[in-house]
From Swiss-Prot:
This is UPF0301 protein Dtpsy_2896. Pfam families: DUF179. HAMAP family: UPF0301. One of its GO terms (cellular component) is cytosol. Gene3D superfamilies: VC0467-like (3.40.1740.10). SUPFAM superfamilies: VC0467-like. Transmembrane segments: none annotated. Belongs to the UPF0301 (AlgH) family. It comes from Acidovorax ebreus (strain TPSY).
Amino acid sequence: MPADTAPMNLTHHFLIAMPGVEDASFSRSVVYLCEHSERGALGLIINKPTPISLEGLFEKVDLSLGREDLTLQPVFQGGPVQTERGFVLHEAMRGPQESEDESPYASTMTIPGGLEMTTSKDVLEALAHGAGPRRVLVTLGYSAWGEGQLESELAENSWLTVGADVSVIFETPVQERYDRALGLLGLQSWMLSPEAGHA
């Protein structure tokens, strides 16, 4: 690779699993990439709901969900890493002029594209009091790739990539998210071959 070629950065992109992906965690999954650098990548699966509702999750952590609009929303399986830990993907809680240090929550990652991922319980406490981010997606667990691992999977045609559209995350019914993400590329699922990229 020429020295002046910038490394690939897929932060704020969707990874869309190709039909050949056999790992049950990732089959027909759409992963929102929160972070991608030469050190690796971190993302959340946005289309695999668990049987637990947000209300049920709040009961498990001794909180009462104070947001009627979120009561029936499912908690998602974010990936196979740290599956007992909660991750909250939400709209940024501060204006563009404010610094990264001004998040109202103790542990928040700022993502280009107007989103944040918070792992501290204070975001749940804000939701319990009827406040907090307007739109949220809560997962148990996350997806991670080590240095060069995602690039290797991309070279093997395990994933399609496309810039993220937050409406797919927050406004699209769960069962339609895979097809909607494909649609961002002008594709439909019937167009994908399980053998793509393999001679």
